[in-house]
């Protein structure tokens, strides 16, 4: 399935992932083919809307964004996805290792990014807009440094190590990166 629906405290959220064009370009020999991210996002959101009764739609993006609100921001894949697929409430951005201290708002869509290498955890709180639109607004967003003051979760750490080793063995070593 192209998406998953999770329910928490009576709120149903559909979540789906995207791989961006520039991310795919880093692995041209992988043999993987991806649709255009904007096209894939639009198709997935339409499918969610026709098949599910959800309160919000969240995109886990490996497309990327930039740190400032310059003209370059408007050219990033995540920004363009937010413009072209306005039904998405939240885009959690990755790939470019961007640290967004503040969320970027594009219409009713918010873009957040917590940097790279598990250095931070983003905490975003969405609340109903209360205007009858059924949309959500970002009421708070903060970055939590994952430093020595935050205890490791043994199960998460074990999974992370497992997937890093798998990526090194199965992919990166073939291209001299491990």
Q: Where are the regions a protein language model picked out?
A:
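Acidic, metal/ion-coordinating pockets
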Residues: 1-149
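A short C-terminal boundary segment appended to hydrolase-like catalytic domains
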Residues: 128-178
């Amino acid at each position: 399935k192209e998406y998953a629906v999770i329910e928490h405290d009576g709120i149903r959220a559909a979540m789906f992932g995207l791989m961006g064009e520039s991310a795919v370009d880093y692995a041209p020999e992988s043999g993987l083919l991806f649709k255009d991210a904007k096209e894939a996002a639009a198709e997935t959101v339409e499918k969610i809307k026709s098949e599910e009764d959800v309160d919000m739609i969240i995109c886990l993006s490996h497309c990327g964004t930039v740190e400032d609100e310059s003209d370059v921001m408007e050219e990033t894949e995540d920004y363009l996805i937010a413009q072209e697929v306005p039904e998405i409430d939240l885009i959690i951005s990755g790939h470019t290792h961007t640290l967004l201290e503040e969320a970027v708002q594009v219409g009713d869509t918010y873009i957040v990014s917590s940097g790279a290498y598990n250095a931070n955890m983003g905490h975003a709180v969405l609340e109903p807009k209360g205007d009858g639109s059924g949309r959500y607004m970002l009421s708070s967003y903060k970055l939590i440094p994952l430093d020595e003051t935050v205890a490791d979760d043994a199960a998460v750490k074990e999974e992370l190590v497992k997937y890093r080793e798998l990526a090194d063995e199965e992919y990166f070593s073939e291209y001299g990166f491990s």
